[in-house]
Design a protein with these regions (language model features):
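Glycine-rich phosphate-binding "P-loop"
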Residues: 1-16
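Acidic/glycine-enriched connector segments
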Residues: 12-115
Length: 115
């Protein structure tokens, strides 16, 4: 199973990330590949999956950011979002990506964070 992990600019809580990814792994134990877009998310994913035999990478799918995000959700089985609507930077972009996942009838999980 291939997943994509999406987070907003302000998201930087590894402990929350780890806790929520533990929930994901329990529900989806057959994850083999993880795609990310944001550097901090990639850093978290690599750290989290380092002993779980999961390959993490940032594929270069397009030039424009929104197109990259759309393609990420198109090529994966499950999209995971760390999201807060009230975050000024990135909230609209993330919302558009979530809408795209819904339109494609793909599986997704949203974790709303506090800080």
């Amino acid at each position: 199973m291939t997943i994509s992990i999406h987070s907003q600019t302000k998201f930087d809580d590894y402990n929350f990330f780890r806790e929520k990814m533990d929930e994901v792994i329990k529900k989806y134990p057959n994850i083999s590949k993880c795609f990310t877009k944001r550097s901090k998310t990639t850093e978290f994913a690599i750290k989290y999956f380092e002993d779980k035999n999961v390959i993490c990478e940032q594929p270069d799918l397009a030039i424009k950011k929104l197109t990259k995000l759309r393609r990420l959700v198109e090529i994966t089985d499950l999209s995971i979002f760390f999201y807060r609507e009230d975050v000024v930077v990135g909230a609209e972009l993330t919302k558009n990506t979530i809408d795209r996942v819904k339109k494609l009838n793909k599986e997704f999980i949203i974790f709303e964070y506090d800080n």
